[in-house]
């Protein structure tokens, strides 16, 4: 099964949650008026699209309806789909780190699939013939994280730099940077601790890591990706808010998109924070993590044919 098919299947619950509601609004009104827009607004917000994104999407839709002189609600559906796609467009430089010597930090609470995402991202980059090192792990307080990364190293062929459980995370990064330079690696992927309970400690830890990178590899391109579990819905927004206070988040990996009713969160996040979703995960295999593409995502959500992308 191609990635688009998997994504479409994975978004079934989200589709039932959002799209069936949208369709009933379109079919339940005979004219486009304030009541129509109010009903559509409520449906989008209830579907985890979020208040900010919903307002922006509806403002855009109203303009398009006016420009195109549309009277029939059923004719709005494609315009709504187009508005959502535009809202989620990443722009030109979303994956600039692939073209540079880079350090990519993966950040997030424990249990969201952070270490697995490091492994899958390593697999994606290895498939582009990049030389990849995984810092295994800056999350040195969780022995299982090191075992997991070792397993991913075996599966993907990416190198791993590991120290014993309880080592200083900044020291792990220091060793990993030295290995990066010696082995002429393209990308260093860093797993980080997921403890938000004590924000002060986490901030200090991330600052220490930043200082090491700044001192040892200042010309490296930096990317800080937060890993969020799509099944947590609005809770994912809270996590992003908390971590964004601690460090500069540049992108999002949205995991567990297969089987969640809360996939609308992908739209909400980008509108509310202006931080792009860069990867989405729909399963356990390496190829089940893919670059985010707004057309592919929205087509899968609305069950629209994705043309030649069917087996991406």
Residue ranges and their predicted role:
Residues 11, 48-50, 109, 139, ...:
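Residue-level signature of catalytic and energy-coupling elements of molecular machines
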Residues 193-195:
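Short glycine-rich anion-binding loops that position phosphate/pyrophosphate groups of nucleotides
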Residues 1-4, 307-312:
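Short acidic DE-rich linear segments
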Residues 11, 15, 122, 206, ...:
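Short amphipathic alpha-helical/adjacent loop interface patches that line ligand
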Residues 1-25:
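Charged, compositionally biased N-terminal leader segments and the immediate start
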Residues 148, 168-183, 197-303:
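Conserved catalytic-core segment of NTP-binding enzymes
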Residues 17-138, 145-166, 173-181, 185-190:
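Primarily NTPase-proximal linker/entry elements flanking Walker-type ATP/GTP-binding cores
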Residues 51-53, 142, 258, 286:
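Short hydrophobic/aromatic residue motifs in ordered secondary structure
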């Amino acid at each position: 099964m191609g990635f688009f098919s998997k994504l479409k299947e994975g978004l079934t619950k989200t589709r039932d949650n959002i799209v069936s509601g949208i369709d009933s609004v379109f079919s339940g009104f005979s004219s486009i008026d304030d009541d129509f827009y109010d009903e559509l607004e409520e449906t989008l917000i209830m579907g985890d699209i979020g208040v900010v994104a919903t307002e922006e999407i509806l403002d855009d839709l109203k303009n398009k309806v006016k420009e195109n002189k549309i009277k029939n609600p059923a004719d709005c559906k494609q315009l709504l789909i187009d508005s959502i796609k535009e809202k989620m467009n990443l722009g030109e430089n979303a994956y600039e780190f692939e073209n540079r010597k880079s350090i990519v930090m993966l950040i997030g609470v424990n249990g969201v699939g952070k270490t697995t995402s490091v492994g899958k991202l390593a697999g994606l980059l290895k498939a582009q013939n990049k030389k990849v090192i995984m810092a295994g792990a800056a999350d040195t307080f969780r022995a299982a994280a090191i075992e997991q990364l070792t397993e991913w190293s075996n599966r993907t062929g990416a190198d791993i730099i590991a120290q014993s459980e309880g080592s200083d995370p900044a020291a792990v990064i220091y060793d990993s940077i030295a290995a990066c330079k010696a082995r002429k690696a393209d990308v260093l992927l860093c797993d980080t601790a997921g403890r938000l309970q004590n924000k002060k400690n986490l901030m200090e830890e991330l600052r220490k890591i930043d200082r090491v990178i700044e001192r040892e590899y200042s010309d490296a391109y930096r990317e800080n990706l937060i890993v969020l579990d799509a099944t947590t819905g609005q809770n994912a927004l809270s996590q992003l808010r908390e971590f964004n206070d601690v460090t500069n988040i540049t992108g999002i990996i949205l995991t567990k998109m297969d089987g969640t009713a809360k996939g609308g969160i992908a739209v909400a996040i980008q509108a509310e924070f202006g931080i792009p979703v860069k990867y989405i995960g729909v399963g356990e295999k390496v190829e089940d993590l893919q670059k985010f593409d707004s057309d592919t995502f929205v087509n899968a959500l609305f069950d629209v044919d994705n043309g030649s992308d069917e087996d991406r």
